A protein has these predicted regions:
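Carbohydrate-binding surfaces of carbohydrate-active enzymes
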Residues: 235, 243, 247, 281-283, ...
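Short, acidic/polar
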Residues: 29-42, 145-149, 262-276, 363-371, ...
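The substrate-binding groove and active-site-proximal loops of carbohydrate-active enzymes
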Residues: 21-30, 51-81, 121-141, 149, ...
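Hydrophobic faces of well-ordered beta-strands that scaffold small-molecule active sites
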Residues: 23-27, 48-50, 99-103, 160-164, ...
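Aromatic-lined substrate-binding rim segments of carbohydrate-active enzymes
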Residues: 34-122, 233-245
Length: 594
């Protein structure tokens, strides 16, 4: 049985398997019959997430979509055939592959039907409630059964870790996207308030309270309850899984969108309750879907990745990057999906987030910009080829192979010797509860993160709870909550104490645009690499740029370095403090500093 853990080297987390460090780059697909396993194996990849679910009920309770043709526990006798076949297919091609089961903890139909009180209504039928103790109990038993099968199988010796998913879209969101609002949910909320605040007869909210701009104590407390409940559920299953695998391998969870999702009723603002869990080794979320993943902006992180690393965890980011080969889901699996959801174009003919670039050239740029962002931040990547066939192109695969090699080579670079972010952006997770649900103030985090991406100034994202540990490293701080929590207020006080210039939103000025952010930062001594609106990536001895228009660009380094082009540029290695090149609109270039 393989042993795995997260180990840091030169400030960057790696997956250590049987004492050997591995750069966290992996591949997965929802449609295994169209999986490009051979392509990625031939490109040097050895890590593979393999999806498996307790049920084939929808993962999206609005559209009714599920990628799962079968659920392990939907039959009288557990059916592991599809999962086993995929694992064996990969190992036949690459006997030394590392397999990571990606387990969807979702209760089968029979359980849902037999326990209506433990469920919550959704547009496509009832599903298990995050509040349900019975769900946690019975779900853990099913998880144990599945894991026992995996650990007793003929491929057990290649299992290197696990990822736990659940809730809506497998991202541990409440199935109803409304805080598991039900009779049982409200009863659990009453107990929560009684135990936490000593209130013998707590008021409970109505649905209308969350839709009319109300923000009273009861509403705010229910929002906190939603997030703590989701976090408790995630931690419960992670703890159980660690027990079942005798703490021998890493466990990750798909959770934590506090820098992207602004609705606390989804349950995703509970990272502060999980970040120190001894049962969770890595966190995953997609790179952000800002502007429908259009070019010209940074596809940033949905959670405070710098905080996750500070607490000894790996950020293993889903990069579901569409390409010129991305097809309609219905065409990729003919006859399976009759409704036209996840279409490539909307009713007005505009591209949706499901549509890829028109050309292989722009597809290369998309992969490069996603890779550059994660490379400089020391995060892992799993390329999510959702419907299969997205990367089946020799040009794309050549780049993906080079990325794998670079990620491995970067292990030896001492990141402290190279330029890094001088700006900290703070996410105040608890501050969402201070605002009416859906109000403009709740969008400030996402808008600020997006605007920062075009300042030409690198930045790190931390939770306000970590301010005392990290502020001394930065020249300036950006806050994102007009109505801060106590943690946010404490972080602001620390800025004053350490004489760190801080940009503070308030009710009169809740949001700052790109130019305002750039001006504030440069006026306070922060180095700007490019002031023309291009996206800049910098860290760990690498620099990248994503161009917003055609023309000559200059990347101004803070000192002179030997520069080696890696992607998107062709010139001899040279020593310079100004990288100059001509770039086409929406192309991406990446360089190594030596």
């Amino acid at each position: 049985m393989l042993k795995s853990n997260i180990e840091f080297k030169n400030g960057t987390p790696y997956i250590c398997i049987d004492g050997v460090l591995h750069a966290p780059l992996a591949y997965t697909t929802y449609f295994e019959e169209r999986g490009e396993y051979a392509d990625f194996i031939n490109s040097g990849y050895k890590m593979f997430f393999v999806n498996v679910s307790f049920t084939d009920l929808p993962i999206n309770n609005t559209t009714g979509f599920t990628p799962f043709v079968s659920g392990v526990f939907e039959t009288e006798v557990p059916d592991y055939a599809a999962f086993d076949a995929t694992v064996r297919q990969i190992l036949a091609l690459c006997p030394d592959a590392f397999i990571f089961p990606r387990i969807n903890v979702a209760m089968p139909r029979k359980w849902v039907a037999e326990h209506p009180y433990e469920t919550v209504a959704t547009p496509t039928g009832n599903r298990e409630s995050m509040c349900s103790d019975l769900f946690r109990l019975d779900g853990a038993m099913l998880l144990q059964t599945l894991v026992e099968h995996i650990r007793s199988s003929d491929y057990a010796h290649r299992i290197a870790g696990y990822q736990l998913c659940g809730g809506t879209t497998q991202e541990w969101m409440h199935h109803d996207l409304f805080g598991s609002f039900s009779d049982m949910g409200l009863e659990k909320f009453r107990l929560y308030v009684q135990q936490k605040y000593g209130n013998e007869h707590p008021a409970v909210p109505t649905r209308a309270d969350f839709k009319d701009g109300t923000n009273n104590e009861t509403v705010s407390r229910y929002g906190a309850f939603c997030c703590e409940t989701a976090a408790t559920t995630v931690c419960h299953f992670a703890k159980k899984l660690k027990e079942y695998i005798c703490n021998e391998q890493i466990v990750g969870v798909f959770y934590g969108y506090h820098a992207f999702v602004n609705d606390y009723l989804w349950g995703l603002h509970g990272m502060r309750f999980l970040i120190d869990s001894p049962y969770i080794d890595f966190f995953s979320s997609p790179c952000a879907y800002d502007c429908n993943r259009n070019f010209g902006v940074d596809w940033g992180d949905m959670f405070a990745t710098a905080s996750v690393k500070l607490h000894g965890k790996l950020c293993f980011i889903e990069c579901d990057i569409r390409t010129h080969l991305t097809r309609r889901m219905q065409d990729a699996r003919p006859g399976r999906y009759t409704d036209d959801f996840y279409g490539l174009y909307d009713a007005h003919g505009n591209k949706t987030v499901w549509c890829g670039p028109e050309t292989a050239e722009l597809s290369l740029s998309a992969l490069r910009k996603a890779f550059a962002h994660q490379l400089v931040n020391g995060s892992g990547i799993w390329w999510f080829d959702m419907w299969g066939g997205w990367y089946h192109d020799d040009v794309l695969l050549a780049d993906l192979a080079k990325m794998k090699t670079l990620a491995r080579a970067a292990e030896e670079k001492n990141s402290s010797q190279y330029p890094s972010a001088e700006t900290v952006v703070f996410v105040d997770e608890a501050a969402y509860l201070n605002n009416p649900r859906g109000s403009d103030f709740t969008h400030c985090v996402n808008r600020t993160r997006l605007a920062m991406g075009n300042t030409g100034i690198p930045f790190d994202i931390f939770m306000t709870e970590d301010a005392d540990k990290v502020l001394h490293k930065y020249k300036a701080a950006i806050f994102t909550a007009p109505l801060p929590s106590e943690s946010g207020k404490n972080a602001m006080v620390l800025c004053e104490k350490y004489n760190i210039p801080a940009l503070l939103p308030d009710s009169a000025k809740a949001f700052f645009g790109t130019q305002e952010l750039r001006d504030f930062l440069t006026e306070n001594g922060v180095h700007c690499y490019n002031a023309d609106g291009n996206v800049i990536y910098c860290g760990r001895g690498f620099v990248g740029i994503h161009a917003v228009r055609d023309g000559d660009v200059v990347i101004s380094l803070p000192a002179k370095y030997k520069v080696k082009p890696l992607f998107g540029a062709a010139f001899a290695d040279c020593e310079t403090e100004n990288i100059k090149l001509f770039m086409q609109k929406h192309h991406t270039a990446v360089f190594e500093l030596l």
